[in-house]
From Swiss-Prot:
Protein name: Nucleobase-ascorbate transporter 8
Domain of life: Eukaryota
Tissue spec. comment: Highly expressed in ovules, endosperm and embryo.
Locations listed in the record: Cell membrane
Transmembrane segment boundaries: 44-64, 79-99, 101-121, 141-161, 167-187, 189-209, 229-249, 295-315, 368-388, 399-421, 433-453, 470-490
GO MF annotation list: transmembrane transporter activity
GO (cellular component) term, any one: plasmodesma
The keyword Methyltransferase is annotated on this UniProt entry: no
Membrane topology: Multi-pass membrane protein
Length: 539
């Protein structure tokens, strides 16, 4: 019997079957990478889909600002159009001359606390005319944005950010990139649940269309079709369902907040929109005004945005199937992002722009990381910002539908950060400490600031100088900022620093991408058009 047992025993598993998954410096499975555009019909549809996704934040942020000032719907529409117009221009600049990644540049939540503090500043309370008060506030935000933009411009174009990010390893990038997505969870289900009857169907349909149906369909063409256009399919179906509920009187006797969240004719955007209007600089009744406190506070928000953008750019490069972004290219992109903030200030957009996290997640859903798609999306932004009536139709998509999209997009960006762990040695106690401690503190510190602000209506740092309060409270309320800065500090200062540690940190994998010339693929993905790299070389 013992002999029979030996004879029937399974042969030992081959050693190669037990090997870990191979490390990939480029993400495979992307149908169209950074430099390979889809056919034009698909490119146009995919570009329109990116435009739809970025509209959510473009509408939500001006709506929040206007609600605190009691301004007219016409002013809200004017803000939305301006922000959309500037976002389109900034996206084109970024794709042609900045990082050259398929990154949509849209409204940033990083600046909202600071802009809100300007909106609520006591110096505007003496202005009795609501319209004049609104215009004066907008001019104050303009002045703060114009000066704060030079932080990005100087840090980026001087090469300072290049020198900083050369010390960034895969290990320290994990919390930074992960929390660029996961850290925005407040914009997900909590906002979806404001109208659960349309938010929940949207997220269910989106997951079915993007994850289940492609695997059930026969043939690669059908599978890719649902991957690429899951957002359009699900949004159209649920938007139509919400419209039927609206005209059927489902929300006629509900609370005003429910109507704002659920109705498809909310907020008077369509009726207040002009047919044609071209946004222009200095449009708020006079020149920008400058306040030292507002400027310092806005610069703090700008620095937070700079750090968060770095994490999102890394995620975008991953989902575009490009090589890790060289520090010189990243610094160049930060400089152009600063130029975009300057445009926001000059045009009076009411908020600054940054790389869009939700559109970075959409790259993963569609598995299309083409630069041309994003350039087409920028064209849609500019076009619909001028043709206000048509743009307002799409801007009236209920916020819970947008929040349902965020649940998937932010998850993908966060997962892109976690995927960088493949370059690190998780059996190292040094790695475990840096990852665990930075992630925990990235959750715990902002939560303390949030709870304190919720209970006391002001942050833990409270002095007579509001600008100083914002300089401290705003950065430590950002999960990506806290976890990213902490991981970067620990990773660069914590001993030992030997060859084994470099391998544990993942530096051996990213070493050849620290210099632009070290890998031929950097030239393919990140070189400037029109032979401009000859005159503006990357190092």
């Amino acid at each position: 019997m013992a002999g029979d047992g030996v004879e029937n025993a399974k042969p030992p598993q081959k050693q190669e079957d037990l090997q870990p998954h191979p490390v990939k410096d480029q993400l495979y499975g992307i149908t169209y990478c950074l430099t390979s555009p889809p056919p034009w019909p698909e490119t146009i549809l995919l570009g329109f889909q990116h435009y739809l996704v970025m509209l959510g934040t473009t509408v939500l942020i001006p709506t929040m600002l206007v609600s605190k000032i009691d301004a007219r719907n016409e002013d809200k529409v004017k803000l939305i159009q301006t922000l959309l117009f500037v976002s389109g221009i900034n996206t084109l600049f970024q794709s042609f001359f900045g990082t050259r990644l398929p990154a949509v540049i849209g409204a940033s939540y990083s600046y909202v606390p600071t802009t809100m503090s300007i909106v609520l500043a006591a110096r505007y309370n003496d202005i009795m005319d609501p319209q004049k008060r609104f215009e004066q506030i907008m001019r104050g935000i303009q002045g703060a944005l114009i000066i704060a933009s030079f932080l990005h411009i100087l840090v980026g174009f001087s090469g300072l950010w290049r020198n900083v990010t050369r010390f960034l390893s895969p290990l320290s990038a994990v919390p930074l990139v992960a929390f660029s997505g996961f850290g925005l969870y407040e914009q997900g289900f909590p906002m979806l649940a404001k109208c659960i009857e349309i938010g929940l169907p949207e997220i269910i349909l989106l997951v079915i269309f993007s994850q289940y149906i492609p695997h059930l369909m026969q043939g690669e063409t059908c599978s890719n079709f649902f991957h690429r256009f899951a957002v359009i399919f699900s949004v159209v179906i649920v938007w139509l369902y919400a419209y039927i509920l609206t005209i059927g009187g489902a929300y006629s006797n509900t609370e005003i907040n429910t109507q704002i969240s659920c109705r498809t004719d909310r907020a008077g955007i369509i009726s207040a929109s002009p047919w044609i209007r071209v946004p222009h600089p200095i449009q708020w009744g006079g020149a920008p005004t400058f306040n030292a406190g507002d400027i310092f506070a806005m610069m703090a928000a700008s620095f937070v945005s700079l750090v968060e953008s770095t994490g999102t750019y890394i995620a975008v490069s991953r989902y575009a199937s490009a090589t890790p972004i060289p520090p010189s290219v990243l610094s160049r992109g930060i400089g152009w992002q600063g130029f975009g903030i300057l445009l926001c200030g000059l045009f009076g957009a009411g908020n600054a722009t940054s790389v869009s996290v939700e559109n970075a997640g959409l790259l993963a859903v569609t598995r299309v990381g083409s630069r041309r798609v994003i350039q087409v999306a920028a064209g849609f932004m500019i076009f619909f910002s001028i043709l206000g009536k048509f743009g307002a139709i799409f801007a009236s998509i209920p916020a819970p539908i947008v929040a349902a999209l965020y649940c998937l997009f932010f998850s993908y960006v966060g997962a892109g950060g976690l995927s960088l762990i493949q370059f690190c040695n998780l059996n190292s106690f040094r790695t475990k400490f840096i990852l665990g401690f930075s992630i925990f503190m990235g959750l715990s510190i902002p939560q303390y600031f949030y709870q304190y602000t919720t209970l006391e209506t002001y942050g833990p740092v409270r002095t007579s100088a509001t600008w100083f309060n914002n300089i401290i409270n705003v950065p430590f309320s950002s999960k990506a900022f806290v976890s990213g800065i902490l991981a970067f500090f620990l990773d660069t200062t914590l001993p030992p620093k030997d060859k084994t540690t470099k391998k544990d940190r993942g530096l051996v994998w990213w070493k050849r991408f620290k210099s632009f010339q070290s890998d031929n693929r950097s030239e393919e993905f990140y070189s400037l058009p029109l032979n401009l790299s000859k005159y503006f070389p990357s190092h």
